[in-house]
């Protein structure tokens, strides 16, 4: 039996990376591999983590072996964990890379693993160049990439960034598979009842944690456009703020949007994800910059049309006029796309959405 260890966040850590890694582990098990996950005992020091907590309140995933060993800021730990993983002598290590801060820790662990002369190391690169730049980013990234044998990216934008650092090693571009582990889709009426939302309102959804690059401020300004107000559209914001909330509330107050912006500004646990996606008419990703987004495969799974901006890999994932609408990253364009969506109607997008969804399997 072939063996693999997935290195990256996993339960009890929360968030999209942990969810993806656990789903990937389940797929390896289904396909007959021996699979374990190697996660963090300390992922981010509290000073560097912008949210309220790094830990999940959901039940532990079943049938997964998870080792919470990596301390991201302790070099002695990196060598110890690397030695532990080297001695396991697994056939394959799949490691996630999403932020240069993790480069020294993960790179050192992998450097130790390579000493066994057997284990192949494949990196799933979520980001190579971060959304928010810091000194040392390129050095940390180069150090990490040097320890990997091959790479997988989930957008052309990340592939291009990777090739700026690593021009010769094998790299494969694949689609971000569906998040199909949040439970079955439910009727919109049931989802709205759970969230105490009106069954008849027009509701657009912004889903996920809030940072500047995600453009929630642009979407709020779009909500203030007269054409959007005339269309009686409401915005449901579901996610924790990873930066100061004040500028967003200032926009809401300035444009008198309080009755039309429904703020659920807390982390959405896995057990509630289906309710939010199924309650919405459309999912909006008004990003200023993007490589790919975990929200997109989530919308595909729950068969929700999308409005995305024409940045990074988003237009490749959301064919314009078929599974949703693509617009420029400014308030006027986003507002026009919202109105166009409701004038067109969600049903117009459903046949294409279901066809495109088939391309996003785990096989």
Language model regions located:
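Nucleotide-activated donor-binding/catalytic signature segment of Leloir-type glycosyltransferases, i.e.
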Residues: 246-267, 271-274
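Conserved acidic donor-binding segment of nucleotide-sugar-dependent glycosyltransferases
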Residues: 320-332, 339-346
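Glycosyltransferase donor-sugar binding loop
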Residues: 40-44, 234-249, 266
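A charged, aromatic-enriched C-terminal amphipathic alpha-helix characteristic of glycosyltransferases
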Residues: 347-363
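Conserved donor-binding/catalytic core segment of Leloir-type glycosyltransferases
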Residues: 198-214, 220-223, 236
